[in-house]
Amino acid sequence: MIGYPIGISDQYNHKPVIRRGITATHPKKDYQGQKHILLDMACFPGSSGSPVFIMNQGSYATPSGITVGNRIYLLGILFGGPQYTAQGILSFANVPNIPKPIVNIPTNLGVAIKSSEILEFEKILDPTHEQ
């Protein structure tokens, strides 16, 4: 995945951050019945819109066996991910109620829309697109 997690980049060279992970669900199956893929990688705010690639160096598996060579394939575009909340307790002297802040904690999972769906946005973004 290539992007700017929580605004981080290589400012000196003007380059985004490249991270790696694995698919948490099979890329050819629709996650939760939608054209989505679940990813097991560090996905933080600022990563939405990042392209997610499959990159194989040296060899990769195909239905007919092992292919020697390199491959890069646009898998999808990250748009979100599950988070859970942790409630902490802050204590203040002489206060009858104890505030309980809710903190979102990333699960290091992300959800991407499949690359096959990218052109569907044309129907939404281009009012002159024939339907």
Locations of regions flagged by a protein language model:
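Terminal peptide-recognition signature
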Residues: 1, 23, 48-52, 114
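A residue-level detector for short acidic-glycine micro-motifs
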Residues: 3, 25-27, 54, 79
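Short glycine/Trp-rich loop-beta-loop segment that forms part of the substrate-binding cleft
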Residues: 1-11
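Short consensus segments that form the blades of beta-propeller domains
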Residues: 11-15, 66-67
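Gly/Ser-enriched beta-turn/beta-hairpin loop segments
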Residues: 13-17, 26-35
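PDZ/PDZ-like groove recognition
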Residues: 87-131
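Catalytic nucleophile loop of clan PA
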Residues: 41-77, 88-93
